[in-house]
Amino acid sequence: MYMARCGPKNNVLCFPFQLSFLFSKRLINKRFKYTLQTEDEKNMMGSLSKNKIITPEDVEFKLAQLREFSNTLKERIHNTKSVNSDGHQSNSIAPISEDSRNVNVTKISSVPNEEKSKNLSDLIHSSFLEKMDHLVPKVIRERVADDDILAKNLFDRSHSNWAPVIDRLYVSEKRFMDIDSREFSVWLNGTVKYLPFHSILHLDEMLLEQINGDVVKFNTHMYECIFNNLGNLKPTNFNQDGTNDKVILKMKELLERYDKALKITEERINKKEGFPSKVPKMTQAILNNCLKYSTKCSSFHDMDYFITKFRDDYGITPNKQNLTTVIQFYSRKEMTKQAWNTFDTMKFLSTKHFPDICTYNTMLRICEKERNFPKALDLFQEIQDHNIKPTTNTYIMMARVLASSSSNAVVSEGKSDSLRLLGWKYLHELEDKNLYRHKKDDLNLFLAMMALAAFDGDIELSRALYYLFIAKKYKTLCANWKGNILVDQDTIWKSTLMPEMLNYLMLAYARFDPRNLPVLSGYEKGIELRRKFLREFDSSMRLDDTDKLVKFKLPFLPISDLNSEAQVLAESNAIWSFNLENGGTRNTLTSSNEAALEDIKKYRQLLDSFAQEAEDFNEFKFKVMYEVTKMQRESINVNVFNKISLHTYLSIPINLKQQKEFLRRLTFFTFQQHEFEAVIKRLYEGYRNIPSSHTRDQNSISTEAISVSKPETTEDLNLIMHDIWYITCLRHKIMMDTTLYELVMKAAIEFQNEDLAKKVWNDRGKFRTTVPFLKMDQRIRIAKDQKFAHLMVEFFTKQGKYSDAIAIILSSKNRFNWTYSMVRNLHKALEEIEDRNSVEILLDVVNKKSHAKALKWEEQELNM
């Protein structure tokens, strides 16, 4: 038993080991704090005369060294204790020898501080070297020849960065030469991960150099290491389809290298030059990495290439993990039929290929997209029948499937409330089981609850959930923020605000109905859960004053219950603007007259320079579009401003029957492609007749009038300023597409606005001639045209213009597959007025135009 003595006297108290270690630990901590404080004071004084700045990374590195030293010291003492603890009780007091009692403590304390600091540094350094021995082989550390690089990039294993280490080895003299390739490659495969592409190329070159270019010696571990790093890469934004992708090309190059190695091996055997000790082999892990990256690129061609290559050449068929990756690819590409076929194949191949919970969760995600709740219930029953343990995500996905299915009365078979109630019960079951939750599960759980509350029209619960999630995320980011919180508010809010949460909140506003009661208020457990969230929602203040430097606030109305349409419209506008202006850190949606004139003056000069520099109209148009995109990213939170959230935001005044507000939102946040091209063309033709801005006197430009080199009428000047302001306002606008045109037609039906219907009919006709529409797949174009024609029939039916509705059907009967569900309302209206002739014509079109004929016609049109 080790003892500790306090003071230099002979008659002293003796403490057991645990208490002694506690005292020594406190003493070390105290000395460390004093040392750090002294160093900080020295650094502060030294900064007056030196330009050296201590970065937060350096401080973190030093603290990590101190923590590692403390842990190592504790382990050493613990090991010493375990060796000497035999035959002693933990609470016994051993006698102290006379030699120990006569030690002069004052003599020990007289050792200079510099020597103590030096000894402490030596201990820390030795502990650090021991730690490095477990991370990298000794020969690698010697060739890197920079312990700082190793420490800063590898010390924290959860955030290790091997790229600087590999790059440093690449420029070293020996690289990987004279290292045993077998043992080294085993360590390499299990350690070096998440390299960027250029570092992967460096690593591959060094591995080839190590084996003197003999591809036969390029073993399986080396292949797996390279493919693993390639599979973890992300494709570039401009090459999402995988066409001529550098990573795909590198993977194919490695497979060609492997084929060459097999060929050389076979030739050596035939020439009786000896069989190699170990021939490299392709593995399932390599195939999975190839498929993983191919799915990221959304490249069906490359995925099919790798599956065929491994199956035919290497005898490796996709396993459970590979097939799950394929299903996930089909899910992202909206190829649900192929996903279901692959899933059924997995169930009937063998027990090794039978789907696991990850595969089932993927299929549940497809059920959510298809709003197929019967199939989701069958899948959940299969999970239970095969004794597969559901995960947290399984219950969450079931709730989301039921929520999305309840949004449509036809899909839900008239049982929307029952589906939402069942969705909440799955979440109650998840809470009762207390399953493990990943950090991403919290987001998915909130999204599931937001979906159920939004489709139920429960605004109070949706507001509470939105507030609680955004507040939690905001405070977490601020607590872990390394920079200046007040200065970096723009970045913090950009990371905090989420488009999915905003979309569900807007959906709750759109489904507002003060007469409906929430589903959760119908049973005790639901009442308790709802009351819990509403109690945590601070509806009056929404302000956190615990930290005076950080104030969190959302622009909700200071009332707990919204009970009027005006309140819903006002709050939805406030929340929408708050998200687009990035938490109020930007001022984009409102501007004074002076600011507007400044913007016009600024962008007139910019557009002038574009027109003079461009060789033709297309180049000028490209420059303007690029500038608009850049301007939008600088002034709007593009993460939340998308077509899905805008569609939901525009649907709020439609459902609340507020025509004026709908038209205001539509005009302010959307633009049309043909109008944009007309404005661009006018500006280009006008600027080509104006000298470059460098030849004009800059002082002649004022906020009241902008002089040009040729006489301009007031009408011309107003038109130019209008066009420039149109371009400036595009920063908060999204181009109208087929979905938004359908929404406008639904608004015309709801408001019975014939002028709006005619306008959207003409505007969509012009949109059909633009490049964005013509680039769409032809089957999609036909489906979109059919949907819009159906809405036109609904509009004329509500207007009582039955002959116009029938005319649309007859003019498109050879193009569209008109079903009875599409003309049901028209048929009922004709029956009511007893127009037998029109009913006969209508039913003749519906009955004769079978689905098979429609497909045949589409096939003929595609061939043409």
Swiss-Prot record:
GO biological process entries: mitochondria-nucleus signaling pathway; mRNA processing; RNA splicing
Keyword Mitochondrion: yes
UniProt-annotated location(s): Mitochondrion
GO annotations of cellular component type: mitochondrion
PPR repeats, residue ranges: 319-353, 356-390
Pfam families documented for this protein: PPR_2
InterPro entries: Pentatricopeptide_rpt, TPR-like_helical_dom_sf
Source organism superkingdom: Eukaryota
Assembly behavior: Binds to mitochondrial small subunit 15S rRNA.
Miscellaneous comment in the UniProt entry for this protein: Involved in mitochondrial-nuclear incompatibility, a major determinant in reproductive isolation between species, through hybrid incompatibility of Ccm1 and its interacting partner 15S rRNA between yeast species.
Protein name: Mitochondrial 15S rRNA processing factor CCM1
